[in-house]
Amino acid sequence: MMQDVSSSPVSPADDSLSNSEEEPDRQQPQSGKRGGRKRRSSRRSAGGGAGPGGAAGGGVGGGDEPGSPAQGKRGKKSAGCGGGGGSAGGGGGSSSGGGSPQSYEELQTQRVMANVRERQRTQSLNEAFAALRKIIPTLPSDKLSKIQTLKLAARYIDFLYQVLQSDELDSKMASCSYVAHERLSYAFSVWRMEGAWSMSASH
């Protein structure tokens, strides 16, 4: 009987079962090796993240990765705002610093020139009125303004015209200009005292 059992051939089904049982045993050590490699690689990557780069990223970004798009946009916006404000401030400083002194100097020059022209005009006008007052016969009590002086000059011209039209002056008065001027001045003063000046001033 023992010989029959030992010499009995092994069926193919038994061989396939034994082979299938051995294959999982072989695959289990291989999968264990692969799992160990994956764990080691994950530990290395975690250690690299916790290194200087990871610490810097966590401290600066507050949990965001250093190369994340959100952090890049924030950095660009802050840099753009800062640069724009600086350029605007620089431009305003240059415009205010370069434009205001020139405009102030121009205004000052225009004011000085206007004051000079006004002084010259006033001086020439005063000189003309002083010369006119010397020609027109005036009373000692006269304190005439410029308008009153012009009115008196107009009345004096009218008086001279009336004198020339009359035949009261003789040849002696005409020959002596000084006497004629004195008499004309006296006559004009009398004419003023009679009320003709008040009538002319009212007109």
From Swiss-Prot:
> Compositionally biased, Gly residues: which spans?
46-65, 80-100
Gene3D superfamilies per the record? Helix-loop-helix DNA-binding domain
User: Pfam families attached here?
Assistant: HLH
Q: Which GO terms describe its molecular function?
A: DNA-binding transcription factor activity, RNA polymerase II-specific; protein dimerization activity; RNA polymerase II transcription regulatory region sequence-specific DNA binding
Keyword Repressor applies:
yes
Question: Which residue intervals make up region (Sufficient for transactivation activity)?
Answer: 162-192
> Which biological process terms from the Gene Ontology are attached to this UniProt entry?
cell differentiation; muscle organ development; negative regulation of DNA-templated transcription; rhythmic process
Question: What are the record keywords, sorted?
Answer: Activator, Biological rhythms, Developmental protein, Differentiation, DNA-binding, Myogenesis, Nucleus, Repressor, Transcription, Transcription regulation
Q: Which PANTHER family match?
A: BASIC HELIX-LOOP-HELIX TRANSCRIPTION FACTOR, TWIST, TWIST-RELATED PROTEIN 1
- Tell me the subunit arrangement: Efficient DNA binding requires dimerization with another bHLH protein. Homodimer or heterodimer with E proteins such as TCF3. ID1 binds preferentially to TCF3 but does not interact efficiently with TWIST1 so ID1 levels control the amount of TCF3 available to dimerize with TWIST and thus determine the type of dimer formed.
Name assigned to this protein: Twist-related protein 1
Q: Which species is listed as the source? A: Saguinus oedipus
